[in-house]
């Protein structure tokens, strides 16, 4: 563990309540696990996981005031539900207070609550890790989501987004349009991947069929040759038997 990670952990342990700190460690751990599975940078994944909730120690009113003071853009959905602002404010703290200048990490932190269109690998890793980390127990369909996350990250993202939207609709909670747009975009990604896989499978079947047909075409002339040779051998054998019978008669 390098010095940067140690310093971040030390700071967060002081600033976050015990529950939030344990959640943070769980997300960082899961980010690393997903990064190993999908061959992504483990260090960047861990930092994103550690800092994703660094601003969640503030109440909604404080976050709203801090975002206004720092001129952080806020959507209508975030104004209706200021709890969402911890993502954008967290990205600001990650940059200004923790010295993170990697834009990919900052963007992943900024969109980890709502998602966004055109999500990067790190965006998806953090989004999914936040939902499935070991300390979670109330989220819907957790066992299935945890398994799916290590099989198909895009499909896991889509499934989580759909589950969250379904929950928000059923409880009449405000829905940020960013999440709706992110879900629609991820659905297109998943459908495009399925179409490509089906096309590849059909191509493979077609190639196998062509190879089999070619082998049959090659085998047919050989069968004809063998048939002719067999007829010739049978003819010779028959003539030999006739000559033998004639000699015995004489």
Q: What does each of the following model-derived ranges do?
A:
Residues 214, 219-250:
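Long, low-complexity, intrinsically disordered segments
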Residues 7-14, 37-159:
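Divalent metal-dependent catalytic cores for phosphoryl transfer on phosphate-bearing substrates
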Residues 167-211, 215, 224, 228:
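Charged phosphate-binding loop/patch that engages nucleotide di/tri-phosphates or the phosphate backbone
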Residues 18-20:
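A short, charge-rich alpha-helical start-of-domain segment used by transcription regulators
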